Amino acid sequence: YPTLISSQIEFILQNSNTKLVFVENQEQLDKIKSSFNSCSDLKYIVVMDDSCDQETENVMNLATLFDKGKEFTQNNNLSFTKMIESINEEDILTLIYTSGTTGIPKGVILTHKNLLSNVEATLKVAEFNSNEKFLSFLPLSHVLERMGGHYTAFAIGATIYYAENIEKVADNLGETNPTIVVSVPRLFEKIHTKFIEGLKTAPKLRRKLFFWALGVGKKYSNMKLNNKKPGAVLSLKHGLADKLIYSKVKARLGGKIKFFVSGGAPLS
């Protein structure tokens, strides 16, 4: 988590025997540099936004790492493809640490099979394709985001947009026009509250239309979820509700949303 302090980061680096760390910027680099001598396994730090102006053999910008990678592939026969093919499904894919809010962070070992079985199960029930656009804003240290908004997108070759920060999510929805957003219930509660608050100052007729459309939508969705075909009258109402209400709500959410995926806790 980017909010972790140096002592917490140092514990995780020591506990995981980390050899290489990628950090976002100079601020995160400064937290880790002080731990270099106390983490015997740590060999390299890579700064992703190329903001390090004092590179060393052990601390380098991402652009420098790319250059070293090109040089390595030219001088070595071990190809990236062969390295991938050598991986076993029981090999460790990642260690995900708890946030540490209630004590010392605990590392959870996840294998390739652990995560890929979840991805495969997701793709069996969700009609995702390579044209999807994910908007990601949960930390990648959060297992829900890692699985739902990261590995799943990789598996289908989709595009991932990363929100600037939680306060900018509403703006980023309009800028990126995502088809899928993975989040925790709190975000959806905020969106719901914002719409309901807006209705309080809306004309009476608009409020009536909104709640009528909401009722139609619930009936229509329940039919679909139970593999039943909505009748002609309900379908007509749904089409009218879409034109009058749904389309306007969708537009405020970027206009292309197909799925909001919620996890981490039950929706109320």
Spell out what each predicted region is.
Residues 4-34, 118-135, 166-180, 252:
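Conserved ATP-dependent adenylate/AMP-binding module captured primarily in the ANL superfamily
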Residues 116-133, 140-243, 256:
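Conserved AMP-binding/adenylation subdomain of ANL enzymes
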Residues 26-41, 188-204, 243-255, 267:
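Adenylate-forming
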Residues 1-68:
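Structural core segment of the AMP-binding/adenylate-forming
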Residues 10, 81-84, 170, 246:
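Short hydrophobic/charged patches on amphipathic alpha-helices used for structural packing
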